[in-house]
Amino acid sequence: MARYLGPKLKLSRREGTDLFLKSGVRAIDSKCKLESAPGQHGARKPRLSEYGLQLREKQKVRRIYGVLEKQFRNYYKEAARLKGNTGENLLQLLETRLDNVVYRMGFGATRAESRQLVSHKSVMVNGRVVNIPSFKVSANDVVSIREKSRTQARIKAALEVAAQREKPTWVEVDSAKMEGAFKRIPERSDLSAEINEQLIVELYSK
């Protein structure tokens, strides 16, 4: 399945919640009606079956992290092999993706922009350039912006927006140096309560 390149707000309306696909400069609810789906008959939201709810939750999380279907299923399989709660394991694996860590540190305004920064070799991990968005970041790894990329206006703008948001407790960022430490893998309580990962586990367990 190809990566979605259409309107970002359309996806948020489809899922009925902010997927954080836009920069966050202004509130998303001022730009679109999240309570109604996109399209001519968007106001009429169908009543979803149990399977429909599970599918929607999977699509929502997949879109939040910008992961394709095959990648997402592989993350689930890995999460199921690990000890502990499969749903929590899944979210933690997604949180350790390099593009997501770059976003959490505020170097990219969105995960899509962060993914582009990684792909364009603007990001280093422990002093080495890494251009694989799915690269798994480990606890205590240091993520930084390459010196020649630090003048990019979009990175500076992203850091300004990030300064207005509540900072994640599991990363430590020096905005002046454009460098951050991934202190630990986040706990479930650190992450969005609007995600119901158990629905995804039920979907893939069938």
Swiss-Prot record:
GO terms for biological process: ribosomal small subunit biogenesis; translation. Gene3D superfamilies: Ribosomal Protein S4 Delta 41, Chain A, domain 1, RNA-binding S4 domain. Residues 96-156 form the S4 RNA-binding domain. InterPro entries: Ribosomal_uS4, Ribosomal_uS4_bac-type, Ribosomal_uS4_CS, Ribosomal_uS4_N, S4_RNA-bd, S4_RNA-bd_sf. One of its GO terms (molecular function) is rRNA binding. It comes from the Bacteria. One of its GO terms (cellular component) is small ribosomal subunit. It holds the Pfam family Ribosomal_S4. The keyword Magnesium does not apply. One of the primary rRNA binding proteins, it binds directly to 16S rRNA where it nucleates assembly of the body of the 30S subunit. Belongs to the universal ribosomal protein uS4 family. Part of the 30S ribosomal subunit. Contacts protein S5. The interaction surface between S4 and S5 is involved in control of translational fidelity. This is Small ribosomal subunit protein uS4. It comes from Shewanella oneidensis (strain ATCC 700550 / JCM 31522 / CIP 106686 / LMG 19005 / NCIMB 14063 / MR-1). The gene is rpsD.
